[in-house]
Amino acid sequence: ARLEPFDSYWQAPKDVEGGFKAFTAYYKANYLPHLPEDREARILVVSCGPGYLLNALAEAGYRNVVGIDSDPSKAAVGQKRGLACEVAEAFPYLEHHRGEYDVIIPEQELNHLTIDETIEFLRLCHDALKPGGRVIVYAMNGANPFVGSENLSHNIDHFYNVTEYSLTQLLQLGGFTDVRPFALKLYVFWKNPLNYVGLAVTSLLELAMRAIFMLYGKKVRVLSKKVGAVARKGA
């Protein structure tokens, strides 16, 4: 991944500071339900960028969180806000921190890596976790017929799409068990009236798509633009 490096977060808006509020709402809706209740859990955020997820975790009371990003200018934004953003590349960092974390979360989509790189990355995450630890990942969802092809073709650093099934396969190849895919929610901004319109329209479309898939003998549960998964390392 050269145009959008996997270990550097690229999705920050032009108003980087303004992004903290929006991304915090997104992360709280999508990630907090999958985190341990223990606020002292050791959490590593890979490709943390300016620290949006770190900020959301801090607001939720998690006190033992560190983020890494390969771009010093992005990490500096979080550092100025008192967030534990370090400048580091993902693969060598994980190699030198084995068995240290309860949770690892990459903020970048897995599909910015090739299949082989993804499996290697997941194995490194597996080794960096404590027994019973978990990883929370996401990638572009190829099961959605409206955006799946565009997701893959959007830039040359998107090497593949996944479905809930193939994302599970990748995590299993990385050594993980108890893989639980979930839909990443886009419409979580409840003060915006258009949020409700988008939620209603996409919910109806996904219901129709599920029915069509059933006619073809396919049982597809996750049809959101992006599909996430939480997976555990054996105890």
What is each of the regions a protein language model found here?
Residues 1-107, 116-123, 184, 224-227:
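Conserved N-terminal segment of class I S-adenosyl-L-methionine
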Residues 54, 144-148, 190-191:
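Short acidic/His/Gly/Ser-rich catalytic and metal-binding motifs that mark active-site loops
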Residues 111-113:
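A short His-aromatic
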Residues 129-135:
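Short glycine-dipeptide loop
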Residues 137-160:
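Short, glycine-/aromatic-enriched active-site segment of Class I SAM-dependent methyltransferases
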Residues 159-175:
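Short alpha-helix
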Residues 169, 180-235:
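A C-terminal cap/extension of S-adenosyl-L-methionine-dependent methyltransferases
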